[in-house]
Regions:
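Short, low-structural-confidence N-terminal segments
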Residues: 1-89
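P-loop NTPase catalytic cores that bind/hydrolyze ATP
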Residues: 101
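Residues at structural and domain junctions
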Residues: 5, 42, 96-97, 112
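Charged, solvent-exposed helices and adjacent loops that form client-binding or oligomerization surfaces
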Residues: 64-96, 112-164
Length: 164
């Protein structure tokens, strides 16, 4: 438990590295190297469900990119240390990433407790969506590269899609 708390503290302190750092094959790059946290290591537990660190990292990266794009579109310089209500922009994106991570774990818990599982129709819809996305990206290799930029691969994308 102490190791998890230490890892979480380290991960949260390295947010800006995740928001602007270099990349590896899955898009996490410097953040994972600096934190030393394995992608599959349980980062937190939500109502008994262990949540791997890659999920938090995905939502953190997505939040950073979304905020970066909003500032770019508005023609504003992005300062992660800029004060906002409750802290800084970096604090805001960390809080949102944690909230999204917890939300998805909560939905999974609810689905499990109510016996909701993906059926053949759901899986067929996911396959059709995959085909559409790969075509939109110019092929599967290009789509897989785009997913890697988000810290995902096909299995992880399908895992998140199956929840949402």
């Amino acid at each position: 438990m102490k190791r998890r708390v230490t890892a979480l503290a380290l991960m949260l302190s390295l947010t800006l590295t995740a928001c602007g750092g270099g990349e590896d094959g899955r898009g996490q790059g410097l953040f994972q190297k600096a934190s030393g946290v394995e992608e599959e290591a349980a980062l937190l537990t939500v109502d008994g469900r262990e949540v791997p660190s890659w999920r938090y990292l995905y939502w953190l990266r997505r939040g950073c990119e979304r905020l970066r794009e909003q500032y770019r579109a508005a023609g504003l310089p992005l300062d992660w240390n800029a004060p906002v209500e409750g802290g800084t922009l970096a604090d805001y994106v960390k809080d949102q990433a944690l909230a999204d991570t917890v939300l998805y774990a909560t939905v999974e818990n609810w689905a499990d407790s109510h016996g909701c599982v993906l059926d053949e129709e759901d899986r067929a819809a996911m396959d059709a969506a995959w085909a559409e996305r790969t075509a939109a990206h110019g092929g599967e290799a290009a789509y897989l590269r785009a997913l890697a930029d988000m810290g995902l691969d096909r299995a992880r994308m399908e895992e998140l899609t199956g929840v949402g």
